[in-house]
């Protein structure tokens, strides 16, 4: 699920990135990203559309569908809840250490 979240978040920020640049920014192989993009497309979370970047070259743009936006929002909330819990646990641990001194 982290992979899906990373890809959805990055697509939302910059839908016109090439697969190669997107894979590089995420630290994934091109094959892994391609597999993930196709899975997200099959789930109806993204649309992949063609556009011409110049006269000779066709590129793709990756767009979140309403379902993709919903999933990204839910994953963002879970991510933030997990980070808040980690912060609270670290703060409690730090408090224990300080009181022992």
Q: For each predicted feature, which ranges?
A:
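Short, cationic-aromatic polyanion-contact patches
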Residues: 1-3, 18, 49-73
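Key DNA-contact positions within bacterial/archaeal DNA-binding proteins
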Residues: 20, 31
């Amino acid at each position: 699920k982290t992979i899906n979240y990373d890809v959805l978040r990055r697509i939302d920020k910059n839908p016109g990135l090439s697969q190669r640049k997107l894979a590089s920014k995420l630290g994934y192989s091109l094959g892994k990203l391609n597999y993930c993009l196709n899975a997200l497309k099959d789930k109806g979370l993204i649309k992949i559309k063609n556009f011409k970047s110049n006269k000779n070259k066709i590129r793709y743009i990756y767009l979140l569908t309403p379902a993709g936006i919903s999933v990204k929002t839910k994953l963002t909330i879970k991510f933030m809840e997990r980070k808040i819990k980690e912060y609270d646990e670290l703060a409690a641990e730090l408090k224990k250490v300080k009181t022992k001194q």
